[in-house]
Regions:
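N-terminal amphipathic/basic leader segments beginning at the initiator methionine
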Residues: 1-49
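Active-site histidine-anchored catalytic micro-motif
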Residues: 3-6, 70-77, 84-177, 289, ...
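Short acidic, glycine/serine/threonine-rich loops at helix termini
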Residues: 6-10, 66-69, 104-106, 137-142, ...
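Glycine-rich phosphate/diphosphate-binding loops that line cofactor/substrate pockets in enzymes
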Residues: 48-52, 56, 82-92, 276-290
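Charged, often glycine-rich, active-site loop that binds/positions anionic groups
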Residues: 59-79
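Conserved anion/nucleotide-ligand pocket segment
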Residues: 162, 170-210
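Hard-cation-handling environments
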Residues: 193-399, 403, 407
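Extended hydrophobic packing segments that form well-structured cores
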Residues: 259, 376-486
Length: 486
């Protein structure tokens, strides 16, 4: 998932480590992911059987950031394509994201699918699952026999998307011919926070999709897109597959359903201090924590998870019983480990990404607890995933607890707080560096959820990005200004 405005590129080592995703695995080791809530896990479970031989090549995913380096793309893509070269496969499945922009190619997944098609030929079906935030391109649609997107955000149905992809592949193998395909592109960009399927209008949109799919006997997908990739095919797409040309009408109807509700996709945001003041007022009469999304520094959208705007707001507002995480600062984590728990350290925390309006936070912090950064997710988003955030620590400043780590991980699972000794259920205010994924595990314990617009590389309002290459006429937000080529 490429944020072309983000400060840090994505290199090969980022894919090796994984971070937001499991670490890179090859060959038979891929099959061990069958029980993880990701598409490849659902696909494996759905395809297993005495008459099916699964031949995995490689699986790798990197925490979202800026452009994927050419070296990383070419090394990993070559492994995938070479694994299919000269083999007599019946079908090919890819677990993709769908919003990769490389240094040398705007459409990483399209390039990979096209290269695979050139190797396996026109008769071997290629099916891929995509993230809900995919920027679906013409090349992707033309190179694959079927693309299947998630339907939930937070992405609780990742494995289900893999199962749906397996079902389509089985049907393609049985019928021996491609389905009719139709696709429509939305005329406006949707803010990331507006895509949450736990609330309207996204919840109703995916309900309408499921009803149309069932009633018409077709396969439908809607990817609202990732509105932080500056290239002409950025944005939402509705597409589907059917036995005949009727699929054109089904796709057109769902697109009209979405566009007719354009005003509902508008999202309100709070300034940092305003968000903290509201949280304090709510928390004063609540028994559960108020959760604030520090959405513009979401590492799941290209942020480095080290901006300090929300920390400053918590301190300035003298918040009590507050926690913020993850603050990614390897130097601060090392200083905490060198000093030891119970000691004070005077450091410049975070603010290292050169984001406009952001700067390091200079203060003397108390080291409350140290951690090796190991965490196993128990929440519904990626239940069972193990992550290693590197040397980590819980620092305190007044009534604020700061969970500092060495490596990036989106604060989407309560155990990321617990690994540093914060019990999230006992806090009054939680500030999560996340946009929506945190809701899967935190909404059940939250008195209220607020969205703050502190400085960060993932602009919550797409119209705030300095676009140069969007499709002419694209509205930069729902009911917003129209993009004009500079």
């Amino acid at each position: 998932e490429t944020n072309t405005f983000a400060p840090s590129k994505t290199d090969y080592d980022d894919f090796v480590r994984g971070g937001a995703f499991p670490a890179m695995v090859r060959g038979a080791d891929v099959l061990a992911m069958r029980d993880v809530n990701i598409p490849i896990g659902g696909f494996i479970r759905a395809m297993e059987g005495p008459r099916t031989e699964l031949v995995p090549a490689i699986w790798a995913g990197a925490t979202p950031a800026a452009h994927v380096t050419r070296e990383a793309f070419e090394r990993i893509a070559a492994e995938i394509v070479d694994a299919a070269r000269g083999k007599d496969f019946d079908g090919v499945y890819l677990d993709l994201h769908g919003a990769m922009v490389c240094e040398h190619d705007d459409d990483g997944e399209g390039a990979l699918l096209a290269a695979l098609r050139a190797v396996v030929g026109p008769r071997v079906p290629i099916v891929a699952s995509l993230d809900l935030h995919a920027n679906v391109t013409r090349r992707m649609l033309e190179s694959a026999d079927a693309l299947v997107a998630y339907r939930t955000y937070p992405h609780e149905d990742m494995a289900e998307a893999g199962e749906r992809a397996a079902g389509l592949l089985k049907r393609l193998l049985t019928r021996g011919t491609r389905y009719h395909r139709a696709a429509r592109r939305l005329p406006f960009l949707i803010p990331i926070n507006g895509m949450c399927t736990m609330v309207e209008p996204a919840r109703g949109t995916y309900g309408a999709l499921a009803r149309a799919e069932s009633a018409q006997g077709v396969a439908l997908s809607f990817a609202p897109g990732f509105p932080a990739a500056d290239f002409p095919e950025c944005g939402g797409v509705v597409w589907g597959y059917g036995d005949d040309a009727r699929i054109e009408g089904v796709v057109a109807d769902l697109t009209d359903y979405i566009v007719s509700r354009e005003a509902q996709w508008v999202v309100p945001f709070l300034e940092p201090e305003e968000a903290v003041r509201q949280a304090q007022a709510i928390a004063a009469r609540a028994t559960k924590p108020v959760v604030i999304a520090d959405t513009q520094d979401n590492p799941g959208g290209g942020g480095d998870s080290n901006t300090t705007g929300m920390l400053r707001a918590l301190v300035k507002c003298e918040a009590q019983g507050a926690a913020i995480g993850l603050m990614v600062d390897g130097a601060a984590a090392r200083a905490a480990h060198e000093a030891g728990a119970g000691h004070d350290i005077t450091i410049a925390l975070g603010g290292q990404s050169g984001v406009d309006g952001d700067a390091p936070f200079h203060a003397t912090f108390r080291v409350e607890q140290l951690s090796d950064g190991y965490c196993r997710y128990d929440g519904p988003m990626m239940n069972g995933k193990e992550t290693h955030a590197g040397p980590s620590a819980r620092l305190s400043l007044g009534g604020v607890q700061i969970v500092v780590s060495t490596y990036k991980d989106q604060m989407l699972d309560r155990n990321l707080y617990r690994m540093a000794g914060v019990q999230p259920e006992e806090m009054k205010i939680l500030v999560n560096k996340s946009s929506v994924h945190f809701r899967a595990d935190f909404q059940p314990i939250a008195e209220a959820i607020l969205v703050a617009k502190a400085p960060g590389p993932l602009r919550a309002d797409p119209a705030d990005f300095p676009w140069t290459r969007l499709a002419p006429g694209m509205r930069l937000r729902p009911l917003g200004p129209v993009f004009k080529t500079p």
